Amino acid sequence: MTESHASSVPAELPAESPAEAGAADLPVAVAALYCFTPLPQFESLREPFRQRMSDDGIRGSLLLAGEGINGTIAGPRELMEPFIDWLRSMELDDQATPFRGMDVKWSYCEEIPFRKTKVRLKREIVTMGVSSIDPLRSVGTYIEPQDWNALVDDPDVTLIDTRNDYEIEIGTFEGAINPHTESFREFPKFVEENLDPQKHPKVAMFCTGGIRCEKSTAYLKERGFEEVYHLRGGILNYLEKMPEEDSRWQGECFVFDNRVAVDHQLQAGAYELCHGCGWPLTPEMKQHSDYERGVACSRCAAEVTYEQRKRRRMRQQQLDQGV
């Protein structure tokens, strides 16, 4: 188990990963990617990125900031890997191949799970709101999926899910602490109120694809925690690499696209999203009398006003018509 930096270790796609082998006939590739790397001229990348994605029929969202790139995108299988190669080999005026070490997690599906192509400029590629944190300077120790079970079995390890409530609701690792956050901005407050380097000598954290843990482990290191670990590549990498019979994962993994969640085979799961409150819905929840597609569910129906219902119904009609 070694400490390294986010932009220094390329995460290449194997010739045939377990996820790819189990999805050989699926025509769409989905790439969840990130890379912490200095981008002083990140604003200038927006248009060439958007144009290349549009030309290749790739949809989804990329975030660009002075600290790097983050996003999830999807497109025709035969065009996605060349696009990732294009990113990794890109040379900028002031840098040679800044995205060479970009971390990428692959999954596959029948249809592109995004409606639009977006390239956005941000202050942070994952918003924690702590300006002193720099994952390029210091992060926790990366743990490979095959070593994760042994680490979390250690009784001295405090295991923390750094994701938000609505994500944890549908799946997590057994024994993990839920910080009960609504956004990643709330995570520092959770740490301040609940964790102590003396009482919690070993802390292990995980998230969907690894990016939040780059900052959460850096934050704990800054606050004096010495043994801080995080799952390399996040839950998605664990689900790909770990045989299901040996897995400690329980449930499905929330993803930020129209699939809503993926199962242990990284295939679209059983959940849909309530567009009223943004929480995932089981098939059983959709049978509730308060559920109305695109409008509300039993969790939020009592808070939805008449005008909100009217607007949401109109929007759902537009979506159904492909507008």
Swiss-Prot record:
Domain Rhodanese: 153-247
SMART domains, alphabetized: RHOD
Catalyzed reactions: uridine(34) in tRNA + AH2 + O2 = 5-hydroxyuridine(34) in tRNA + A + H2O
Matching InterPro entries: Rhodanese-like_dom, Rhodanese-like_dom_sf, TrhO, TRHO_N
Gene3D superfamilies for this protein: 3.30.70.100, Rhodanese-like domain (3.40.250.10)
Main EC class the enzyme belongs to: oxidoreductase
Pfam families, A to Z: Rhodanese, UPF0176_N
GO molecular function terms listed in the Swiss-Prot or TrEMBL record: oxidoreductase activity, acting on paired donors, with incorporation or reduction of molecular oxygen
GO-annotated biological processes: tRNA modification
Catalytic residues as annotated in Swiss-Prot or TrEMBL: 207
Keyword match Oxidoreductase: yes
E.C. code: 1.14.-.-
Keyword list, A-Z: Oxidoreductase, tRNA processing
Family: Belongs to the TrhO family.
Role played: Catalyzes oxygen-dependent 5-hydroxyuridine (ho5U) modification at position 34 in tRNAs.
HAMAP family according to UniProt: TrhO
NCBIfam families linked to this entry: PRK00142.1-4 (NF001136)
UniProt-recorded name of the protein: tRNA uridine(34) hydroxylase
Organism: Rhodopirellula baltica (strain DSM 10527 / NCIMB 13988 / SH1)
Gene it is expressed from: trhO
